[in-house]
Amino acid sequence: MTEKILILDFGSQYTQLIARRVRELNVYCEIHPYNKAPQIDGTVKGVILSGSPCSVREENAPDIDLSLYREKLPLLGVCYGAQLIAHKSGGTVQPSSIREYGRARLNNVHTSDDLFKEIVPDSQVWMSHGDTIVEIPSNFEILSSTETVRVAAYKVKGEDTFGIQFHPEVTHSLQGKELLRNFVVHICGCSQDWTPDAFVETTISELKAKIGTDKVVLGLSGGVDSSVAAVLIHKAIGPNLTCIFVDNGLLRKNEYEEVLNSYKHMGLNVIGVDAKKQFYKSLEGLSDPEAKRKAIGKEFIEVFDQESHKIADVKWLGQGTIYPDIIESVSVKGPSATIKSHHNVGGLPEKMKLKIVEPLNTLFKDEVRRVGKTLGIDDIILKRHPFPGPGLAIRILGDITAEKVAVLQEVDYIFISRLKEKGLYDQVWQAGAILLPVKSVGVMGDERTYENVVALRAVSSMDGMTADWIHLPYDFLADISNEIINRVKGVNRVVYDISSKPPATIEWE
């Protein structure tokens, strides 16, 4: 079985970053809520306790039984985790005289200790805490300090138990990855053999054993996750996988034909379904974003169910669920409040009474892309920007008509094509155009016009949880605006969205 690091989540915004940094070392790890920790077995090589927005001084502060891990496994507490270990061991945690948030420099670094091996004195780290450890038990040893924090890191003498007040998972901690390597590789003894190649080999074997000769149906979206999931399952069961790709009339220009051809070249058995009329009919008169999402989701389930019933003896539904979806559903805070409902597959398993197979549900997005590369999937698929399940329906503010879709498809096509031509596409996490529900006055050919306004959006992000708007060159934006207004009939004004997430979301609806 695969060896792993167990990360116990106390609600920190950075917990997923810890997991990503550990996995970048080719070491498998899992995140579990602190109050739903799994039983320790022989595969667990070490435990990391995350940060938290809580204080160990609070009456109902998140707590665990440290005896389950101490002196049994290497243990690393990060920020709140470090304070928790110290507090429960008899140390004193108090509010900081000044809240330390941002960059700090380590001093008095014990580089002789395995945790700080090759960490340079004066190394920059990232702090984010309101409490601080002011007294440590007699069997604790301070490993480093900062100008304002005496106990920036410590070790329990005679144990592989450590605490650090800073966040090594954040890129502002310049040697954070090295420190995590010291813990995971040198102290925990992980062998660094969790690679995309190893994942593919193991997953295909597991899928063969799990599915056997049963048939699987999978809905393709043209995106990375469903595509990689399909190829993995296909490698395991071959023609017993049938994929369904639905044209809901809300895709980008030429997308249906291009993606369908790509899938067929990949050797997948794909059924293409032209359902534009059904989707447009279900969206008639709807302008509320949530109502549009739900209508699209309901229609997708109907279409997918109809097509699936044409395939005899299907037992499994394949899905491209990835690890952040799983983490969110079992997070410390519980499932998040619904900001936007998921567009399609939510009702499928119940309606179709199929067993679920999710081969990517342990992977982050960047890992899915690396696995796709290992599988030989073309960059046209792997490097595609995320595209919302409801498609252009949530980029057309207000009601949906075929005419509006056609206008937005042309605008989007120009924007994306020029990003690719100028070498900017791969620098952007996600880009697209939005048709606004307003018109503006303009002048074209000495005549007054009163036509549509479109917004362009381009953001950078690691995982879509947060995002910054991209500073596209002014000349590029000027050229794009000019081309859109001249080529797309019905548009006389172009604006550029310079909002970050939060407070805005990436999509407008």
From Swiss-Prot:
Record's keyword annotation contains Transmembrane: no
GMPS ATP-PPase domain boundaries: 194-384
A Pfam family it matches: NAD_synthase
Gene3D superfamilies per the UniProt record, alphabetical: 3.30.300.10, 3.40.50.880, HUPs (3.40.50.620)
Binding site for ATP: S221, G222, G223, V224, D225, S226, S227
Positions of the catalytic residues: C79, H167, E169
Residue span(s) of domain Glutamine amidotransferase type-1: 4-193
The keyword ATP-binding belongs to this UniProt entry's keyword annotation: yes
Any GO molecular function: ATP binding
EC number: 6.3.5.2
GO CC entries: cytosol
Annotated metabolic or biological route of this protein: Purine metabolism; GMP biosynthesis; GMP from XMP (L-Gln route): step 1/1
SUPFAM superfamilies: Adenine nucleotide alpha hydrolases-like (SSF52402), Class I glutamine amidotransferase-like (SSF52317), GMP synthetase C-terminal dimerisation domain (SSF54810)
Entry keywords, A to Z: ATP-binding, Glutamine amidotransferase, GMP biosynthesis, Ligase, Nucleotide-binding, Purine biosynthesis
Matching HAMAP family: GMP_synthase
Function field: Catalyzes the synthesis of GMP from XMP.
Identification of the protein by name: GMP synthase [glutamine-hydrolyzing]
Gene (name only): guaA
